Design a protein with these regions (language model features):
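Extreme N-terminal starter segment of soluble prokaryotic enzymes
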Residues: 1-5
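Active-site mouth loops of central-metabolism enzymes
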Residues: 9-16, 129-134
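Cys-nucleophile CN-hydrolase/nitrilase-fold catalytic domain and related Cys-dependent amidase chemistry
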Residues: 11-92, 98, 161-182
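Short hydrophobic-aromatic micro-motifs
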Residues: 34, 127-133, 155-156, 185
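CN hydrolase (nitrilase-like) catalytic-core segments centered on the catalytic cysteine
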Residues: 52-69, 138-227
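Short beta-strand scaffold segments in enzyme catalytic cores
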Residues: 70-72, 84-88, 119-120, 201-204, ...
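Active-site catalytic loop in hydrolytic enzyme cores
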Residues: 78-152, 162-175, 242, 248-249
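A short C-terminal boundary segment appended to hydrolase-like catalytic domains
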Residues: 235-259
Length: 259
C-alpha cells in the first residue's frame, strides 16, 4: 500500500480546504491512501456532518480514486452534543467510517463528548486500518481493540509543540509498532494553533524480524521536521501479516495463576 503523509501548515484562523483538495488531487494515481493531521481544517465551529467541507473532500477523493483519512471534524449531533470525529473516505468518495476521538485533552473535555465506539475501518475490500487521534495513541487498550478487529495499519494524528514532546510521541509510535507488529503512519500538526506553535514531526515506522524469527528493532522510514510537504511511503502489509502469524506478544494469552 502506498500512503501519502500530508504535513500541511495549518494556522488557527485560516482556511485550508483548498490546500487539502489540491493535495488529494495531486495524489491521484500515485497513492492508495492520503492521511492528514488532526486539526487539518483549522478552527471551525461544530456543525452536522458531513459538512460542506467534508462533502468537497468526498468529491475530490472520488475523482482522484484515492482513500482519505481526515483529521478531526467538529461533529454536532443534535440531542447528543459534539464529538471530534475522523472521517474515513474510500475511493468512491463514500464515508465508510466516522471514528470519534476517545481520550480528550482537558480543554476539549469542556466542549466535546468522548467517543465510545470503534477506532478502525476497512478499505479496498478488506484492508483494516486503525485511526488514533491525539492521546488515543497512548491508550494501549484502544490500540489493541483496533488491532483485534483487524487493523493492519495504524494511523495516528498528533500535535507536538517541543522537541522533547515529539520524541515522547515517537517513542509511543515505535512501541505500538513493536507491540502489534504493524506499521504506524503518524501525521504531525504544523503551525500555530491554540496559542502554541506545533512543529510537525510526521513519522512512519515499521516492525522488523530478526534472523531467528523474533521481533527486531523498529525501523523509522520517515521522520519529517517542520517542513510543509507530502511524502509517500510504500508498506508491504502482506509481509507484516506474515510476521504476525510467525510471532505474537499476545499468543498464548497470559493466564494468571489461581491463588
Amino acid at each position: 500500500m502506498k500512503v501519502a503523509v500530508s504535513q500541511l501548515r495549518v494556522e488557527e484562523n485560516s482556511q485550508h480546504l483548498d490546500d487539502i483538495l489540491e493535495t488529494i488531487a495531486y495524489a491521484a494515481d500515485q497513492v492508495d491512501l492520503v492521511c492528514f493531521p488532526e486539526y487539518f481544517l483549522g478552527k471551525l465551529a461544530p456543525e452536522p456532518m458531513p459538512s460542506p467541507a467534508v462533502a468537497a473532500i468526498q468529491e475530490v477523493a472520488r475523482l482522484a480514486k484515492v482513500n482519505v483519512v481526515c483529521g478531526v471534524t467538529r461533529d454536532l449531533r443534535h440531542g447528543d452534543g459534539s464529538y471530534l470525529t475522523s472521517m474515513v473516505i474510500d475511493r468512491a468518495g463514500q464515508i465508510v467510517a466516522r471514528l470519534d476521538k476517545t481520550c480528550l485533552y482537558p480543554a476539549e473535555q469542556l466542549w466535546y463528548r468522548a467517543g465510545q465506539g470503534q477506532l478502525w475501518a476497512e478499505l479496498d475490500g478488506g484492508i483494516g486500518i486503525g485511526v488514533l487521534a491525539g492521546f488515543d495513541l497512548l491508550r494501549a487498550d484502544l490500540v489493541r481493540a483496533a488491532v483485534r478487529e483487524g487493523a493492519q495499519l495504524l494511523i495516528a494524528q498528533f500535535a507536538a509543540d517541543s522537541p522533547e514532546y515529539l520524541e515522547t510521541v515517537r517513542s509511543a509510535i515505535s512501541t505500538r509498532a513493536l507491540e502489534h507488529l504493524a506499521p504506524v503512519v503518524a501525521v504531525g500538526q504544523l503551525g500555530n494553533f491554540f496559542g502554541r506553535e506545533y512543529i510537525g514531526g510526521s513519522t512512519v515506522v515499521r516492525p522488523t524480524l530478526s534472523g531467528a524469527g523474533v521481533p527486531g528493532p523498529v525501523e523509522r522510514i520517515l521522520a519529517m521536521e517542520d517542513e510543509e510537504d507530502m511524502w509517500v511511503v510504500e508498506l508491504d502489509l502482506d509481509a507484516f501479516r506474515e510476521m504476525r502469524h510467525r510471532f505474537s506478544y499476545y499468543d498464548p494469552p497470559r493466564i494468571p495463576r489461581a491463588l
